[in-house]
Amino acid sequence: TSKADYKKGGASTRSAVVRLSNAISLEPYQSDLEFLTNMGLAQRQNLENGIAQSEIHRSYYSYTISIDLDRIGVDVEIEVSQEEKASRVKELLDTVQYLYRDIRGRRENLSPLFIIGGRYKRKNPFFENIVSVKANKIGVATLKEIVEDSEELKEYTYTGITSGIFDNEKDVKEKLKAESVGNVFKHLKEEVDAYYEGN
């Protein structure tokens, strides 16, 4: 807490156990317009319909999620079981794997088309701001260099790609040993179980 517990105005603060970077567009901004009507509002107010517009942008986005496994389920006075910690992390991984959002009456799929990461001793977001896409091709050389710079990264990094999306899919599979995105999430969950069974 920022003040002693017995003093008024104290606020509980702690650094995040799960960190999410900003989602960064990997392509230049290209907008289009969607024309809408405000028919519902107009009918309720006995007004004329007006045309509204909203911007539409389609792009690949990159973001990084870092999870401090040591701190999951741990607070000042309580600590949940290892099984509960593993369950919480695996639920988060399931959420990311099937991520979507509902907006303006439609559902948008936000699940990953490409994923790279693993469980590492160093608590470092190794791949943050590293993934790039140019001409619908994932920048393999930089990712390969980072993975090969460390024995730990070589051994514990998993790469997944969704088939039929990127033009250099074969290159990604060969050079980064990529498999399906679903298999990567399966491996990550196995790593979570192994971590909590060993601690």
Predicted segments — roles?
Residues 1-199:
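Basic polyanion-binding and macromolecular-assembly surfaces
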